[in-house]
């Protein structure tokens, strides 16, 4: 039997936000024991995108042993992630609660549950956005 996966970099706290348009509510969940990595990508002259264009990207890893997906939290595209313990946000504040306006905030574009030997081991989530706050831009552009 293989040794269990270790997550030495998963020592951060994040806050998840999920909007429910039908109920006009925002669900806020604080999760500890995660790895939240942000990075900046700039396009040089001669690349496939306009020279000087930039995007910010993030990768989030949530070990199942720290928080169980679907039980302790939910996460899906269009949700938002804040580095650290984030503020309470009302539904009327949601449209202004964007990565372009709030430092430390990221917009989720994908969520992928990873398994080993048929058991969930961690969830990966990520996304990217430009200075204007728009997302879903290919990092290969």
Question: Model features per residue range: what roles?
Answer:
Residues 1-66, 103, 110-141:
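N-terminal disorder-to-order initiation segments that are Gly/Lys/Arg-biased
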Residues 70-109:
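Short, acidic/charged, Gly/Pro-enriched secondary-structure junctions
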């Amino acid at each position: 039997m293989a040794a269990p996966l270790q997550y030495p970099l998963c020592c951060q706290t994040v806050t998840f936000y999920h909007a429910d348009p039908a109920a006009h509510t925002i669900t806020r969940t604080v999760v500890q024991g995660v790895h939240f990595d942000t990075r900046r990508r700039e396009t040089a002259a001669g690349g496939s995108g306009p020279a000087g264009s930039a995007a910010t990207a993030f990768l989030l890893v949530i070990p199942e042993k720290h928080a169980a997906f679907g039980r302790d939290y939910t996460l899906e595209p269009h949700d938002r992630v804040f580095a650290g313990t984030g503020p309470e946000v009302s539904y009327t504040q949601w449209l202004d609660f964007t990565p372009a306006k709030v430092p430390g905030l990221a917009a989720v574009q994908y969520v992928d549950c990873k398994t080993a030997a048929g058991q969930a081991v961690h969830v990966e989530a990520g996304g990217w956005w430009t200075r204007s706050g728009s997302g879903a831009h290919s990092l290969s552009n």
